[in-house]
Amino acid sequence: MRRYVAALDQGTTSTRCIVFDHGGRVLGLAQREHEQIFPRPGWVEHDAETIWRNTELVLAEAMRTLELSAADIAAVGITNQRETTLVWERATGKPIHHAIVWQDTRTDRLVGELGGAQGPTRYQDRTGLPLSTYFAGPKLRWILDHVPDARERAEAGELCFGTMDSWLLWNLTGAHITDVTNASRTMLMDLRTQRWDEDICADFGVPPAMLPEIRSSSEVYGEITAGPLAGVAVAGILGDQQAATFGQACLSPGEAKNTYGTGNFMLLNTGTTPVFSKHGLLTTVCYRLDDQPAVYALEGSIAVTGSLVQWLRDNLGLISSADEIEPLARSVDDNGGAYIVPAFSGLFAPRWRPDARGVIAGLTRFVTKAHLARAVLESTAFQTREVVDAMRADAESQQLDLELTTLKVDGGMTANDLLMQFQSDILDVPVVRPVVAETTALGAAYAAGLAVGYWSGTDDIRANWAADTTWRPTMSDQDRATHLAAWNKAVERTYNWTA
């Protein structure tokens, strides 16, 4: 009896294997971190071969620790850091360059050139995305331009491009495939047809021969060829934020989740018709189950939230561990008038200002490190409020029935009760954390399990979801308005630093 489903969660800082039972509960997990490589300011890379070795190790470790074999696992799902870009040799499977990570900004000038006179929105009506260093297409173009002979080899069919899902699947099964959610983050896929857009690929100088096949998020892509799970089907792939949305059972239009990690990523399910934002949000594929129509989402991507706590710890030394920030912030009643805008690599949604850089505003002699700790946490909530406002503006202007009444949350920072209460206060809606915190891996497990009949349908996913903690707003309208006005003033101080 195949009693469990395994998920591989290939993230920005680590790779994990998590095993789930039919109730969506975590049976056990294994995790390995990998190095963050910073060759130059603004550049971020990963060693993809190390990530693959770590994948093999966590698979084996999880099976060994739980005393399971391939006969116990119904299917494997993959979820991954999105946009991180890799090119490898088809014949040897060897990368020709380190993976270029989603946070990397080396393509800033290239993005401007690609936009031309039309600017960042040149391809948005087809891809749902503004031209940005964030997405995979410009990163791929950079590799083709800068690695000797890469373009010629790609045109000859000797090279494969993929995001990290494709890299893991290639090594597990030999198949060169991506799913529609990851493809939707490349800037090379037409959102409506869910196929590679030949004209955009030509504009980017990307040979179609190197692109993976686009498939649904829930189907059998192939069987694992070696290791402790040899013969088990890989049957689900979702980009990490889409996986968290699926794992949070945001399966109906108007349901939204916000993941608090290195950055914040809020997705709002908009149903089977793509909604193109006029207010700085991304339009993306939320998921597609086998041959069913794709479900779309509006997304607000925030670059720096949890990593701001790391900055406070590692760069300023104001705390020695991340979990010290909550008691420090609680030791004062408010932020003392200080606001921190962490535009370390520009501002993502909804402002999209690559010229912005971080500021601390409102400093006086009264401000202590406790006030700064509180300002760090509050900046996450303020940035989330901006995304929610953009979603509301899109819904109103396009007459969509997508009112956000509750926000489901997940990710490491949701353990911070002070932040979650402030988030509820500044949004003026309840904030709900689920019982199962591993929503990203759970979403990938659900996609894989549905494909092989382990779960019978999405009703099973809804039934598995349960609330753990709910925070309700207590802030007055006047206090909320005062905070938001001060925050906006601080954000506007970040503009034009690199112009």
From Swiss-Prot:
Which pathway? Polyol metabolism; glycerol degradation via glycerol kinase pathway; sn-glycerol 3-phosphate from glycerol: step 1/1
The record lists ATP as bound by 12-14, 262, 306, 310, 412
InterPro entries tied to this protein: ATPase_NBD (IPR043129), Carb_kinase_FGGY (IPR000577), Carb_kinase_FGGY_CS (IPR018483), FGGY_C (IPR018485), FGGY_N (IPR018484), Glycerol_kin (IPR005999)
Q: Where is the signal peptide?
A: none
Gene3D superfamilies linked to this entry: 3.30.420.40
Q: How is its activity regulated?
A: Inhibited by fructose 1,6-bisphosphate (FBP).
Concerning its family, UniProt says: Belongs to the FGGY kinase family.
What protein name is recorded for this chain? Glycerol kinase
**GN (gene name):** glpK
